[in-house]
Amino acid sequence: MKLVFSALASLLSGASATIYYAGVAESSGEFGVWSATQTPGTGLPGRFGVDYAFISEAAVDVHVDQNHLNLFRVAFLLERMCPPATGLGAAFNETHFDYFKEAVDYITVTKGAYAILDPHNYMRYNDPSYQPFSGSVIGNTSDSTAATTEQFGEFWGELASRFNDNERVIFGLMNEPHDMATSLVLANNQAAIDAIRAANASNLIIMPGNSWTGGHSWTEGSDPSSALLNQFKDPLNNTAIDIHEYLDYDFSGGHLECVSDPETNLAALTAWLKENNLKAFITEFGGSNSTSCQEMLPDLINYMADNAEYIGWTAWAAGPFWGPNSPCCTNSTQLGSLEPGSTAVDGSPGLYDTVWLPVIQPLVPTELQWSGPASISGGELTSRA
């Protein structure tokens, strides 16, 4: 009986310890370019620390030292890294890159956590003034102003060459491609993967699908991600799928109430991942401080923990420039954010105090990966508590 119980305990431990990486999305690096009149060039290149910033080191300290998070998804804009005057590719704005690298190094070197590099561009380039809809679709050969698939690969080859010695850096190929052919999403992803590996970078890659890379829609529609996204090739077999999943009625994350059951809506994706022997991160999810979201957010986090296909997550969103504004709930936009110390517009506690601490923080695994390279198979789980 002792052997039976020992084997059972081992199986149960393996089944429950599937989350290796947990944290927050750091959103502010993409700020400062939006224009109500969709005026190209608005906010470019922008003033670092005034129009945009990547992280608050003090907030990262709180999330690592007190909340014991080991993953941060750091947003940036392609147009700031690769100015439109020179085009998408290997020519970087070195001043901007240095600011970005400083943030990534603080997370990974100083704090010993992991960082996802997040080009927050919706598979578009040259005009972020009306995101997520402005700009030319990368690889669209019918648009003479569009950056090419080859240029996208060149960009990723250059970026990877600058981080290939940092095993704690994860390459998130693109935020939320949408309204384009899934075959083009695959082609762009593959160009990036090929260039990253050619740059002698063995880092973990996370790869998006089409239709805002939504988990609920992964197998749906006439051109679903599920039909093609399993055809990518990575010679190192170190690429995971990047998923976003919100719980409001239209899956946008823009409403106060959570009404979409994650177990039901992720079932088809989870089956697809299992069938194709793939792993996934959910790098965007979140909700308001409503009762419905307080009930359903744990359902999503527990679903990931209970299904071995999911190995990491980042909640949307923290970031130094949110102020009282909210990364959720466009019908009530000033509830604060997941940034420590955030407050709502009326001075009451923000989403960090009303959602993160009471709802999400208790579900952060007590053991996460704190050493070794990020990978689809994870690493040794240890506690920092």
Curated annotation (Swiss-Prot):
Designated gene of the protein: eg 1
InterPro entries membership: Glyco_hydro_5, Glyco_hydro_5_CS, Glycoside_hydrolase_SF
Biological processes annotated in GO: cellulose catabolic process
Signal peptide as annotated in the record: 1-17
UniProtKB keywords: Carbohydrate metabolism, Cellulose degradation, Glycoprotein, Glycosidase, Hydrolase, Polysaccharide degradation, Signal
Gene3D superfamilies attached to this UniProt entry: Glycosidases
Catalytic-site annotation from UniProt: E176 (proton donor), E284 (nucleophile)
Entry EC no(s): 3.2.1.4
Reactions performed catalytically: Endohydrolysis of (1->4)-beta-D-glucosidic linkages in cellulose, lichenin and cereal beta-D-glucans
Family affiliation: Belongs to the glycosyl hydrolase 5 (cellulase A) family.
Organism: Robillarda sp. (strain Y-20)
Record's function text: Active towards carboxymethyl cellulose.
MF annotations from Gene Ontology: cellulase activity
Glycan attachment points: N93, N140, N200, N237, N289, N331
Name used for this protein in its record: Endoglucanase 1
Record-linked SUPFAM superfamilies: (Trans)glycosidases (SSF51445)
PROSITE patterns: GLYCOSYL_HYDROL_F5
UniProt pathway: Glycan metabolism; cellulose degradation
